[in-house]
């Protein structure tokens, strides 16, 4: 089995073990979860030590520039005149994702250790924790946009329940606010994903594809497709590629979060249980930044270059706004939330 697949789905295996164990053994749930995260950390370190560097692995728009790749046919539908829809289970890593995999594995171990303080409904908590673990790892390894989107959305449900059920006094408010913010961005991300799918063809099959690596290569866009560079298509009077970049950027900026899309984070940090706060600060915000680098900059590089000043300005505003607000806080978690806004800026 591919080691990335094993890394992603190990939490599912341990989750099934927890699910099958009786409640009388609930004291063992935390040790099982810790073992799962330690195994992931060990595998991440092994992957890092065996990661190859050099000119041959430079770039992002060819599949052979990624490592530990596994590509399997997953969903295949005949859409008649629209052709065949092929969705692949496609995972692999490059220099960006390998660093984040190791960091994520370490943070998950720390979060698992901090879960010792959880006393109620242990089975539910650790099952949701492991589901979140799987989704996070899947995001960093996915090279198929549909698969990426699936893992990206899968993070939302466990986080919603972890905050809403084990959080503080205002946990329901914080959980719903987080859910609505993220859902708003996800709906628009879905629209751009479909547009990209209809714009890109796989040179090997001639069919439309969700393959993110193919989306990063301008040669794979149909001439008159909505996101073709040569097509110069417009949406509401604006260049279609600019609209696509902005919509995806907003979706990921909510997760970063970038000012003024940050207001869900202080509430979520304060109300979330400590293990979830660790994951929010240490992993979730980085996923937003990863999405901007991997997808926004990877698929729409010319738009990112043109708008570099405005992106930089947003970053500076987030840095200063987050820092000054962090200085004014007396609650430690709220201070960490605002400092995270500053750091991500």
Language model segments and positions:
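Transmembrane helix-loop-helix hairpins at membrane boundaries of multipass inner-membrane proteins
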Residues: 2-3, 21-113, 117-127, 209, ...
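Residues that define the loop-to-transmembrane-helix transition and helix capping
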Residues: 2-5, 30, 123, 143-147, ...
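Central hydrophobic cores of alpha-helical transmembrane segments in multi-pass inner-membrane proteins
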Residues: 5-20, 35-49, 101-115, 132-134, ...
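Hydrophobic/aromatic positions within or immediately flanking transmembrane alpha-helices
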Residues: 8, 30-33, 101, 126, ...
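Functional transmembrane alpha-helices
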Residues: 11, 94, 144-162, 254-301, ...
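Alpha-helical multi-pass transmembrane bundles of energy-transducing inner-membrane proteins
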Residues: 25-26, 131, 135-232, 236, ...
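Juxtamembrane/interfacial segments at transmembrane-helix boundaries in multi-pass membrane proteins
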Residues: 52-88, 188-261, 292-310
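Short juxtamembrane and helix-loop transition motifs at transmembrane-helix boundaries
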Residues: 85-92, 107-119, 140, 240-243, ...
């Amino acid at each position: 089995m591919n080691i990335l697949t094993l890394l992603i789905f190990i939490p599912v295996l341990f989750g099934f073990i927890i699910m099958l164990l009786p409640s009388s053994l609930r004291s063992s749930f935390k040790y099982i979860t810790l073992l799962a995260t330690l195994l992931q950390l060990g595998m991440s370190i092994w992957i890092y030590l065996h990661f190859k560097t050099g000119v041959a692995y430079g770039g992002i728009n060819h599949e052979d520039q990624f490592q530990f790749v596994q590509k399997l046919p997953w969903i295949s539908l005949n859409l008649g005149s629209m052709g065949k829809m092929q969705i692949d289970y496609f995972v692999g890593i490059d220099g960006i994702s390998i660093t984040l995999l190791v960091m994520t594995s370490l943070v998950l171990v720390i979060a698992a250790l901090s879960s010792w303080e959880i006393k109620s409904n242990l089975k539910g908590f650790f099952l949701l924790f492991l589901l979140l673990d799987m989704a996070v790892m899947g995001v960093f390894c996915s090279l198929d946009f549909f698969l990426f989107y699936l893992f990206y959305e899968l993070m939302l449900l466990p986080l919603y329940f972890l905050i809403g059920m084990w959080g503080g006094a205002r946990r329901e408010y914080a959980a719903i606010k987080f859910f609505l913010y993220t859902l708003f961005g996800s709906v628009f991300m879905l629209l751009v994903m479909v547009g990209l799918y209809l714009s890109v063809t796989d040179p090997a099959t001639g069919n439309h594809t969700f393959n993110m690596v193919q989306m990063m290569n301008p040669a794979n866009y149909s001439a008159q497709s909505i996101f073709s560079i040569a097509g110069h298509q417009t949406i509401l009077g604006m260049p279609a590629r600019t609209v696509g970049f902005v919509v995806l950027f907003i979706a990921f900026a909510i997760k970063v979060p970038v000012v003024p899309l940050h207001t869900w984070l202080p509430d979520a940090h304060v109300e979330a249980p400590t293990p979830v706060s660790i994951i929010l600060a240490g992993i979730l915000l980085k996923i937003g930044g990863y999405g901007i680098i991997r997808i926004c900059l990877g698929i729409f590089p010319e738009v990112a270059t043109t708008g570099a000043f405005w992106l930089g300005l947003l970053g500076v505003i987030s840095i200063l706004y987050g820092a000054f607000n962090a200085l004014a806080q007396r609650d430690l978690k709220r201070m960490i939330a605002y400092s995270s806004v500053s750091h991500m800026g």
